[in-house]
């Protein structure tokens, strides 16, 4: 397995009883229950070795790549659509995979990378770059699925903002929100002015501003 290709082995569990009890038994065997659906076929219940899945989850690209699931020797091209983790320990408890059909568009959430923040004039002027998204839902055919969307913020001044429609998209890729009739072109990053801390002027009175009589009184006390 490389970052550009993810392959997992799985076992078909469709013939077995499903449910919470069955899922618990699989987890006790260090297996993660999962399901494959879509592509005009019936859903298939499967299990994956937890160590294999955890290793793949270490890569951000796993969530935005076409994956290969080898189910009892039969390969399935899929994308991961949902992952349930243990609320406290974080290990995977269940996964949903969607079959990929060649030439058929899919909806996927892909990560967003912001580049050039240190070079931005706004940053150099003390501004704060505020990023409002970590991923964006896109629509495209499987062969055009990008690993991530990169947004160059190196030209942002204080007060500038970046909207969904400002993103330079790869060929064949559209943003799902902008395709909706009621979709709105929301802000995804902006450059805010420097944070100014309010100073308690009463506590910052300069000694030079204190009347001479008061200074003399303090000095006389120090000399006693």
UniProtKB/Swiss-Prot annotation:
Region named Disordered: 195-224
Acidic residues: compositionally biased ranges: 197-207
Annotated keywords: Ribonucleoprotein, Ribosomal protein, RNA-binding, rRNA-binding
Keyword field contains Ribosomal protein: yes
GO cellular component: cytosolic large ribosomal subunit
PANTHER family named in the record: RIBOSOMAL PROTEIN L25/GLN-TRNA SYNTHETASE, ANTI-CODON-BINDING DOMAIN-CONTAINING PROTEIN (PTHR33284), RIBOSOMAL PROTEIN L25_GLN-TRNA SYNTHETASE, ANTI-CODON-BINDING DOMAIN-CONTAINING PROTEIN (PTHR33284:SF1)
Annotated family: Belongs to the bacterial ribosomal protein bL25 family. CTC subfamily.
Subunit and interaction comment: Part of the 50S ribosomal subunit; part of the 5S rRNA/L5/L18/L25 subcomplex. Contacts the 5S rRNA. Binds to the 5S rRNA independently of L5 and L18.
Protein name (Swiss-Prot/TrEMBL): Large ribosomal subunit protein bL25
Lineage of the organism: Bacteria, Pseudomonadati, Pseudomonadota, Gammaproteobacteria, Moraxellales
Gene name linked to the record: rplY
């Amino acid at each position: 397995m490389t970052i550009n290709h993810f392959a997992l082995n799985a076992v078909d569990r469709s013939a077995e009883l499903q449910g919470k009890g069955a899922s618990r038994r699989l987890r006790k065997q260090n297996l993660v229950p999962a399901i494959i659906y879509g592509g005009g076929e019936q859903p298939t219940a499967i299990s994956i070795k937890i160590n294999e899945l955890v290793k793949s989850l270490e890569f951000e690209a796993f969530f935005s790549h076409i994956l290969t699931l080898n189910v009892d020797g039969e390969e399935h091209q899929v994308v991961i659509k949902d992952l349930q983790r243990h609320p406290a320990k974080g290990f995977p408890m269940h996964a949903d995979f969607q079959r990929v059909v060649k030439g058929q568009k899919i909806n996927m959430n892909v990560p967003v990378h912001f580049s050039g923040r240190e070079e931005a004039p706004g940053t150099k002027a003390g501004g704060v770059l505020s990023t409002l998204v970590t991923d964006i839902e896109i629509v495209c055919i499987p062969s055009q699925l990008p690993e991530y969307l990169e947004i160059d913020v190196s030209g942002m001044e204080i007060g500038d903002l970046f909207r969904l429609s400002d993103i330079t998209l790869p060929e064949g890729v559209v943003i799902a929100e902008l395709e909706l009739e009621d979709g709105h072109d929301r802000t995804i990053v902006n450059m805010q002015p420097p944070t100014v801390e309010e100073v308690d002027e009463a506590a910052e009175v300069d000694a030079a501003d204190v009347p001479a009589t008061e200074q003399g009184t303090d000095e006389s006390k120090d000399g006693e």
